[in-house]
A protein has these predicted regions:
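Short glycine/serine- and acidic-residue-enriched loop/turn motifs that recur at repeat junctions
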Residues: 58-76, 109-127, 160-177, 210-228, ...
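A short beta-strand motif characteristic of beta-propeller blades
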Residues: 78-80, 129-130, 179-181, 230-232, ...
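Secretory targeting and sorting signals
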Residues: 2-31
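An edge-strand/N-cap motif at the start of beta-rich repeat modules
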Residues: 30-62, 71, 75-78, 94, ...
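Conserved core positions of repeat-based scaffolds
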Residues: 45-48, 57, 96-99, 108, ...
């Protein structure tokens, strides 16, 4: 597709510099939000949900991905238009974001050139629009140019760009509205949308992936693309969590061990090497105490069952959080970080939700995505403005 965004150009540029519409009135961001319930790091922006159920975002906003009815970049949280309560989750993608309400409805905003907002148009929106024909949903994940959700009945549905089969409907036809992933019509537990691939956990706990497989990111011990789900090698049951990234994927198995596969140029698989792998390899030194693992583009992080965060891979902007800018092929401890309950990985930054429900971020901050009311990158955690 000639007009598709060039990811290498996006990477190079940053490394140099780094249907239905809501009609509720915009709410001002809380001056001093006390607590959050979740946080999601996107490529150049971040969003959270407060304990009041309000959605707020910060960082780059050229396409309206902050959702505040503007295209003004912000280095501190701004309120998403109309979503001031009753939201339980949020997902930040490349240049768009999506939220899930307590009633199971999905709203998306931002870049929409390929229909990734799901409102049956290709019109960008700086405020939330409802996803068309989706029904009730239990989870949503915004990827690069596509989005996926799991319905309350466990069907996996995706929409947006499909040039590499990342929608999983056994075609490469893009869709402005949700389509059902081939064979995943009920019982699915989770979905993770990435750059040009997607992964899900089935009712039986198997990890299945689809889309581009040029670096083995589908994990089926091949490098063959697939327009429909294939089973990840060795992960046929009891998979607890999965995270699809740029060209790599990670998961937590039934023994609470972190496994990763795919592209490994910066050590983002965490196996103390830079060797790509088309099937899962264990993350060096983590053992069986992993609660969740997240990967994005060039680095990955894990949250242990004791609430500690460890990261590995690319670290030029301090995104590993170990108070250095040295890359690491194996996990390093995040510097001076409170006990955490969630970790989320963006392009060149990382964020956590602490046990005290504060949001802290670190890494590249050229667009204000760290949220501390500055554009200064940091190699150790800082509180998001207002916490």
């Amino acid at each position: 597709m000639a007009s598709r965004l060039s990811w290498p150009r996006v990477v190079a540029g940053l490394l140099v510099a780094m249907g239905s519409v809501l009609v509720m009135p915009a709410a001002a961001a809380d001056a001093a939000p006390s607590k959050a319930i979740t946080v999601s790091a996107g490529y150049y922006h971040t969003c959270d949900v407060t304990t009041k159920g309000a959605v707020r975002c910060w960082g780059y906003n050229a396409y309206g991905q902050l959702g505040d009815n503007s295209t003004t970049t912000s280095n501190k949280p701004v309120a998403v238009y109309g979503l001031s309560s009753k939201v339980k989750n949020v997902s930040s993608g490349y240049m768009h974001s999506c939220a899930l309400t307590t009633k199971g409805k999905v709203w998306c905003w931002g870049y929409n050139a390929y229909g990734q907002l799901g409102d049956n148009t290709t019109t960008n929106s700086s405020k939330p629009v409802a996803v068309a024909g989706l029904g009730k949903v239990k989870s949503v994940d915004a990827g690069y140019l596509h989005t996926c959700a799991v319905t309350t009945k466990g069907a996996v549905k995706c929409w947006g760009y499909n040039g590499q089969g990342q929608l999983g409907d056994n075609s490469t036809t893009s869709s402005l509205t949700p389509v059902t992933v081939y064979g995943l019509t009920k019982g699915a537990k989770a979905v993770s949308a990435a750059y040009t691939n997607t992964c899900a956990i089935t009712a039986k706990g198997a990890a299945r992936c689809w889309g581009s497989n040029v670096y083995g990111q589908l994990g089926d011990n091949s490098t063959t693309n697939s327009n429909k789900p294939v089973t990840v090698y060795g992960l046929t049951k009891n998979v607890k969590q999965i995270s699809a990234g740029y060209y790599s994927t990670c998961a937590v198995n039934g023994k609470n061990k972190a496994l990763c596969w795919g592209y490994n140029s910066q050590g983002q698989l965490g196996d103390n090497s830079t060797t790509n792998s088309p099937k899962p390899v264990g993350v060096y030194g983590l053992g069986s105490g992993v609660k969740s693992v997240k990967t994005a583009v060039l680095h990955s992080c894990a949250l242990t069952t004791k609430g500690k965060v460890k990261c590995w891979g690319y670290n030029v902007y301090g995104e590993l959080g170990d108070n250095s800018t040295t890359n690491s092929l194996k996990p390093v401890n995040v510097y001076n970080l409170d006990k955490s309950t969630k970790v989320t990985v963006g392009y060149l930054h990382t964020c956590v939700l602490t046990a005290k429900k504060a949001v802290k971020c670190w890494g590249c901050n050229g667009s204000g995505q760290v949220g501390d009311n500055s554009t200064t990158s940091t190699s150790q955690p800082v509180k998001v403005y207002g916490f």
